[in-house]
Amino acid sequence: LSAAPALAGDAAKGEKLFKRCAACHSLEAGVNKVGPSLADSVGRECGTVEGYKYGSGYQAACEKGFVADEAFLTDYLRDPSAKLSEIAGSKQRSKMAFKLKKDEDIADIIEFLKTQ
């Protein structure tokens, strides 16, 4: 089930939290690391980061089609593999092993990403 963030996010807190994400993600368009660039990521259609090789789990979910809106990102940041499995309709694994446990942290990171 999708759930929109229950809390209003704080972009400044999200920026601090993003430092953990920066180990695998860039905020610069066209600069991919282990994970895709997160520039303009909120509202982006799945699988559209140029030059990034998505994992098979993400590709399987993309075949069903989705947009990385706030509801998707909330669920994905909580449990990436579970969200991809839900969309694909079969067990999938995300390349992103990191999970956020606190709803407040999720809302803060999404709010920060909306500014990028």
Residue spans for each PLM region:
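The canonical Cys-X-X-Cys-His
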Residues: 19-28, 109
